[in-house]
């Protein structure tokens, strides 16, 4: 049953993505409406899967690459649903739905066995540190989706709508940046308790810091209005691969203290 929920979410995300893109290209509103509700159903399966896995494991399901990727896809989906409810974010769906599907597809390639937490992970900081990372990464990915929409629709959307889109990307980055700050600070305190050192320049720590600095630069430039909306859109789009490398690439290519995942 547990695997069935996971693959139901994966299949629903895939079908929703195909229908959303097809409906957008051929301007079929009924198709995109169906795509949306299938995506919501996928997010529900994703949610139930994580809850069930957590109950079975008797811990938060965030301890390895598979669990984090599954939660990451869920974070993208849940935040997109929240944006849709609050801001009618149809413009972001065609980019965000494929991201949720691709992240969950990556999870499907990882070992799915439920294992006991390593002693170093049995900490009160576990949920705050990793849970904040889930939503931080999701916010950055959605900001990138918004930036991509800005670039693709620059000549078609009125200036007021482009400005609104730019502001939403800014708010998503600000949220992601705040959460990433929590990730780094909580991780430093946790590391001092587990390994007697606040900072070890572990590859994951280093790339998290690089990501933090990158988005700090974006926020500085955006608040000072130093660059155009187009440059800012390119910034958040190009920053997404850095986020994904911090998540996937570091664990795969650069072994360190975080290699347990």
Language-model region placement:
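Polytopic transmembrane helical bundles with strong interfacial aromatic enrichment
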Residues: 1-261
């Amino acid at each position: 049953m547990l695997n069935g929920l996971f693959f139901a979410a994966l299949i629903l995300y895939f079908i929703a993505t195909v229908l959303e893109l097809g409906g957008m290209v051929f301007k079929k509103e009924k198709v995109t409406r169906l795509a949306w509700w299938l995506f919501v159903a996928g997010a529900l399966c994703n949610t139930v899967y994580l809850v069930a896995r957590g109950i079975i494991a008797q811990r938060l399901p965030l301890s390895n690459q598979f669990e984090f990727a599954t939660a990451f896809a869920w974070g993208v989906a849940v935040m997109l649903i929240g944006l849709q409810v609050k801001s009618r974010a149809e413009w972001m769906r065609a980019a965000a739905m494929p991201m949720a599907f691709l992240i969950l597809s990556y999870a499907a390639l990882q070992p799915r066995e439920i294992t006991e937490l390593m002693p170093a992970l049995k900490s009160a900081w576990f949920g705050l540190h990793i849970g904040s990372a889930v939503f931080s990464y999701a916010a950055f990915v959605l900001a990138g989706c918004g930036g991509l929409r800005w670039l693709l629709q620059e000549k078609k959307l009125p200036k007021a709508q482009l400005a609104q889109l730019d502001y939403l990307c800014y708010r998503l980055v600000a949220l992601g940046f705040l959460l990433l700050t929590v990730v780094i600070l909580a991780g430093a305190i946790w590391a001092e308790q587990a390994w007697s050192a606040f900072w070890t320049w572990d590859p994951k720590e280093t790339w998290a810091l690089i990501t933090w600095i990158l988005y700090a630069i974006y926020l500085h430039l955006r608040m000072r209005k130093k660059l155009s909306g187009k440059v800012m859109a390119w910034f958040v789009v190009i920053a997404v691969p850095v986020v994904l490398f911090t998540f996937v690439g570091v664990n795969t290519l650069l072994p360190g203290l975080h290699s347990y995942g």
